[in-house]
């Protein structure tokens, strides 16, 4: 590497120094920008630093709770976390795996879902295991699934007091492209894969999981996502820009999207339309990502797959659409009875076979055909 140029001599002290005088700039009319050399010697870059680095990513899920986070009275249970999830980017050089940077991130948890006209609790997990990043998407868009509550996609209409105006408008910032969208400024898409006998990677479908930016900064250190691995927006831009600077890629341009959804809320219908996606940078060599299982906490060792009704403050319990009530016991729902205002009890029981009605069947989420925009956030 070429040796740095000798540092320029520092300027002589000036009494009553005025920076505008020294640079011959009129503070009232500065005119075109001026440049001034500064005495700075850039540190020598490490040997492994080049234009096409052998990069890998590891996402540690940290402490993971699968248990339902509310008790029989609808009060939040304590689920302490000592190890927060984090993302680490590595490079491998001469057989040594070198960590380059580590950032806080999120994993999935219990979130609200709109199922059969009712808002439920549903565990939205972050699957562990190997995946790959095949593309980086700038200014991505989020296509909300039918399970997204309509109110989450609406904003108060500032003109709602005017005649003929609806009380809400579609929140276009939530879908994007926008710094405040569900996917933030940039996203990397997670794909499952299989390695063939000759070492090639066979890339499979998009599971809807992303590593992406987010404007909800406090969620990254304290709360859960819908399954995606959120990063602070500025961190996501730094990370993905580094990947593109050190991984050969090609520009595929803007995604074409034809997405629409009609939403009913408080007797009004609102139409959401998305006609264009983000700008795609396709990586010539996918980046391998290992999502670690983390440390499972509590008594439930696997994700609860069925939805759980929201706590009904009036009835005083978790009430199913058919009027039956249930309690959450570990990874199961058990029937219970709720007292009536007159002190009696309602016959709130599950079906005779004791089964919990399947509520996911009507809202299947695509896996192999999810496309590059996915369903989670």
Map each language-model feature to its residues.
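N-terminal pre-domains immediately preceding structured catalytic cores
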Residues: 1-377
């Amino acid at each position: 590497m070429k040796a740095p140029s000798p540092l320029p001599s520092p300027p002589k002290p000036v009494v009553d120094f005025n920076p505008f005088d020294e640079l011959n700039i009129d503070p009232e009319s500065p005119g075109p920008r001026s440049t001034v050399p500064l005495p700075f010697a850039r540190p020598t870059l490490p040997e492994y630093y080049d234009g096409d680095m052998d990069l890998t990513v590891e996402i540690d899920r940290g402490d993971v709770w699968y248990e339902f986070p509310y008790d029989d009275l609808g009060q939040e249970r304590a689920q302490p976390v000592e190890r927060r999830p984090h993302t680490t980017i590595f490079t491998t050089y001469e057989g040594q795996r070198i960590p380059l940077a580590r950032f806080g991130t999120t994993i999935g948890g219990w979130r609200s879902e709109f199922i059969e006209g009712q808002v439920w609790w549903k565990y939205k997990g972050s699957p562990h295991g190997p995946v790959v990043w095949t593309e980086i998407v700038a200014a991505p868009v989020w296509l909300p699934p039918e399970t997204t509550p309509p109110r989450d996609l609406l904003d108060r209409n500032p003109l709602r007091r005017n005649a003929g105006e609806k009380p809400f408008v579609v929140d276009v910032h939530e879908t994007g492209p926008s710094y405040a969208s569900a996917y933030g400024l940039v996203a990397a898409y997670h794909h499952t894969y299989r390695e063939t006998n000759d070492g090639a990677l066979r890339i499979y479908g998009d599971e809807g999981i992303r590593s992406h930016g987010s404007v909800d900064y406090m969620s990254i250190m304290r709360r859960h996502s819908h399954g995606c691995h959120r990063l602070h927006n500025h961190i996501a831009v730094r990370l993905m820009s580094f990947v593109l600077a050190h991984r050969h890629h090609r520009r595929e341009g803007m995604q074409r999207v034809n997405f629409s959804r009609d939403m009913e809320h408080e007797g009004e219908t609102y139409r959401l339309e998305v006609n264009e996606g983000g700008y795609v940078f396709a990586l010539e060599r996918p980046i391998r990502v290992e999502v670690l299982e983390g440390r499972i906490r509590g008594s439930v060792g696997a994700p609860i797959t069925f939805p759980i009704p929201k706590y009904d403050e009036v009835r005083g319990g978790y009430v199913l659409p058919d009027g039956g009530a249930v309690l959450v016991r570990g990874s199961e729902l058990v029937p219970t009875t709720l007292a009536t205002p007159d002190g009696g009890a309602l016959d709130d029981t599950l079906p005779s076979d004791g089964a919990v009605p399947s509520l996911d069947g009507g809202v299947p989420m695509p896996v192999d055909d999810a496309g590059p925009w996915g369903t989670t956030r």
